Amino acid sequence: MSEDEAAQAPGPSLSEQDQQSAVQRVAALPLIRATCTAVSEAYSAAKDRHPLLGSACRLAEHCVCDLTTRALDHAQPLLSHLQPQLATVNDLACRGLDKLEEKLPFLQQPSETVVTSAKGVVASSVTGMVGLARQGRRWSVELKRSVSHAMDVVLEKSEELVDHFLPMTEEELAALAAEAEGPEVGSVEEQRKHQGYFVRLGSLSTRLRHLAYEHSLGKLRQKKHHAQDTLAQLQETLELIHRMQCGVTPITPARPGKVHELWEDWSQRPLENGRRRHSQAELETLVLSRNLMRELQSTVDALETSVRGLPPSAQEKVAEVRRSVDALQAAFADARRFGDLPAAVLAEGRGSMARAHACVDELLELVVQAMPLPWLVGPFAPILVERPEPPPDLEALVDEVIGGPDPRWAHLDWPAQQRAWQAQHGEGTVLSGNIPEEEPEPPSRPKHTLMPELDF
């Protein structure tokens, strides 16, 4: 065809130019063109390497071309009818392509440039991640060193506190001395330094539980001895009253108590009008008996609180002691002389005191043989009771924190405070009418608030 004929030949319509322009723009994108070229080269190379595959591919190409031609022939009337809609879609596609090229500039760049940029970004990211990993490793090493030092300090301080507040028992000291006699045995501190944290923590926990258990048993034994001493004095008082009612001279025991001392002091007093006043001695004896009962009742209260988490059998032992004390206290409440106490009441009281003495022995034996108890080996809060309001005697229970001891004896320890109180109140005053004033109650021992279940 000559140039004139080509110039006179009818050209494509505007919509066809727009449609061809949209398709051409998509196909002309460097990234799309490079991808299509790579796929075409791989397809051609595969056909050349495998003759059978090449024949099959050429047959498939021929079939696809025929099908496409026939489909276009049948769809041509429909495409001509939808020409305005296709033009609109083509226009929208061109606008979307413009926006896409603005947002993704690399679509207009050659594939080599895109790959090079991607490699640079990946390399920069990897370098940054490697730097962060190295920095994190340095931080982890520093953190590990700090945690290691902190754990050493905490464990050393914990061991010092345990040694201070719960010192070693005689058995542990003997075992430590036996180990020290062996060859090349380091000190306890040196051995602790060579142990791991979990080993030291486990041994500290086991030792703390053992020492707390021994400390609690020691407190319970002290309460047991105190209760049995008070029970023995009450038993002695009941026996003396019984003998006096029968007209028998009391026998002084090997270890005379307060009642026998009172009667000996009374017997050495000068006569009044040729006789001694028995009523005065009887009244003082009854007052002393009531004081012993109140002291025993406070001891039973402490025992009852300490066995709250024990099995019912142990709680029943303390309850039996309380019933005996309450019954005896009710019998002595209105007595003004020995004649007000029936012989049956005295006999029953002596029997109940003997049973209470046995119950206290059985209680300690039950605690020692039955178990290490949860409230002894930890946790150190066996029973938490929610109360709607603070108890009325809260200040007395936490006097070590919010109350404080008597300011006169604040600088003294507990045994010295007891001696000071006894020196001040050793001689009770006598009221008018020959009725002695009741002896003021001695100061109670401050109760610790950090581990109250260890104070029975």
Swiss-Prot record:
What compartments host this protein?
Lipid droplet; Cytoplasm; Mitochondrion
Consult the record and explain the modifications the protein receives after translation.
Answer: Phosphorylated by PKA. Phosphorylated on serine in skeletal muscle at rest or upon lipolytic stimulation.
| Chain intervals for the UniProt region annotation (Interaction with PNPLA2 and ABHD5) | 185-456
Post-translational modification Phosphoserine, affected residues: 2, 148, 324
Q: What Pfam families does the database record attribute to this sequence?
A: Perilipin
For this UniProt entry, which residues form the secretion signal? none
**Recruits mitochondria at the lipid droplet surface: region residues:** 438-456
Q: Does the keyword Mitochondrion apply?
A: yes
Extract the ranges annotated as region (Interaction with LIPE): 1-108
Q: Cite the residue spans of the region called Essential for lipid droplet targeting.
A: 1-173
Which keywords does this chain's UniProt record carry? Answer: Cytoplasm, Lipid droplet, Mitochondrion, Phosphoprotein
Q: Which InterPro entries match?
A: Perilipin (IPR004279)
The function of this protein is: Lipid droplet-associated protein that maintains the balance between lipogenesis and lipolysis and also regulates fatty acid oxidation in oxidative tissues. Recruits mitochondria to the surface of lipid droplets and is involved in lipid droplet homeostasis by regulating both the storage of fatty acids in the form of triglycerides and the release of fatty acids for mitochondrial fatty acid oxidation. In lipid droplet triacylglycerol hydrolysis, plays a role as a scaffolding protein for three major key lipolytic players: ABHD5, PNPLA2 and LIPE.
What family is this protein classified in?
Belongs to the perilipin family.
Can you name this protein?
Answer: Perilipin-5
Which gene is transcribed and translated to give this protein?
Plin5
